[in-house]
Structures are given as structure tokens and as C-alpha cells.
Amino acid sequence: MGVVLLVRHGQASFGSDDYDVLSETGWEQGRLLGAWLADRAVNPTLVVRGDMRRHRETAEAMLAGAGWSAHVEVDPGWDEFDHLGVVGAHPETPTGELDRREFQRVFEVATERWTAGLHDGDYPESWPGFTGRVRTALDRSCAQAGPGGTVVVVSSGGPIAAASAALVDPGADDAAYARLWNRLNTVVVNSSVTRVVVGSTGPRLLTFNEHPHLEGETLTYR
């Protein structure tokens, strides 16, 4: 069977002028991930990453930690949704800077509004548009893995949660799918690995959010 490993990017720079840059911890998480995968004899036939700086930097750190020379392909289908746009579109979002705890509270309320699908015109990318492109990206990566290859995908928590929710309950209605996504999205660890196996009956979720290479201060969610 083919294998697709979905990797969340390392810790980005929350609260800085440019979130889309790995922190020092994020770089270390990427290197630790690469070393851990190499120790387990993972040898990817292809590395795919989203088209964001944090995806590129995580891929660079992972490749360095693993000592891989795999080809890297960019697929914007694995990009994160515009989380700041979603938060900013919520009418009750406070003005001014928010600390991590307050931002998380506002983020969860704002994403619930977004996933409800009742205000699609308020967002540059609607919830159906986001989930549709992620499912298409997952299909591409599974096809690239083929019957016996290994594709490592560097993405973000939102797309990984969307792909995982779709695989866990393919027949879920829109509301149930959104609820499952919300639960999964809040717990995806930086540089964690979610494993998808690809067989004759299609892709199946094998594991979600593996992170044994992390401990102490290297274990982060934001």
C-alpha cells in the first residue's frame, strides 16, 4: 500500500509582525521530526508542501534533520485557510492585540461562524471552497503515493484536520463534518504526523497527530 504522511508545520511566530515565519522552536521541531522519521526508515518518494513560508521552512528543517535528498513539490491545495481573515470577519472580534488564550477563544467562535456556511460572502474563501480544495489535494497526494510509495506532505492544522475528518466519517453531513473538523483542528501539534494508507479501496486514516519526537518546550500547539 501507499502511504501519505501529513505533517503540520513547526511553530510559527505568533504575535510577531509576520506569523508565517518559523520560530526557533519551529525550526528545531522540523529537525527533530526529520531525524525521527529517518530513524524509522522512512524514505519518501516525494515531499509535497503548501505554498506558505512556514511550510517551506518546515520542509527544509525536516529534510536537514533526516538527511533526505527527496524531490520537493509545491501544492497550494495544502495551504492553510486565512485564519486572520476568518477571525477579522467575525462581528464580535475585539480590537487590539490578543494574548494566546484570548485569541484561541475568539478563533474557535469565529471558525464556528465560518463553517456554518451562512455568511460565505464575508470570506475570501468559503468553508466549502476550503474543504473542497483540501480533498482535491489529498486525492493528488494519494495518487502520487501510488501502490507502494511514500509521500510526505507539509501543511497546516486546518487542512490536516479537514482531510482527517473526511477520512474518519466520509458519510457525515455538513454540520457533523464541521463539528469534527473543529474538534480535530484545535489539537493538531506542531510538526505532528498523521498517517494515511492508500489501498485498493482508497485512502484510510491510520493514525492522527503522532508526536513522540517532541517533549517539554518543543511540544506546542501554536
Residues covered by each model-derived region:
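Active-site metal-binding loops of divalent metal-dependent hydrolases
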Residues: G10, G157, N209-E210
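Short beta-strand scaffold positions
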Residues: R49-G50, G132, V154-S155
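Acidic, low-complexity terminal tails and accessory targeting/binding regions
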Residues: W68, F81-R101, P147-T150, A165-R222
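Active-site-proximal alpha-helix that buttresses catalytic centers in soluble enzyme cores
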Residues: G2-V74, P128, R222
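Glycine-rich phosphate-binding loop signature in dinucleotide/nucleotide-binding domains
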Residues: R40-N43, S141-G149
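Generic beta-sheet signal
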Residues: V4, G149-S155
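Phosphate-handling substructures
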Residues: G65-R135
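Conserved histidine-centered catalytic loops in small-molecule metabolism enzymes
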Residues: P44-G77, E102-T115, R195-R222
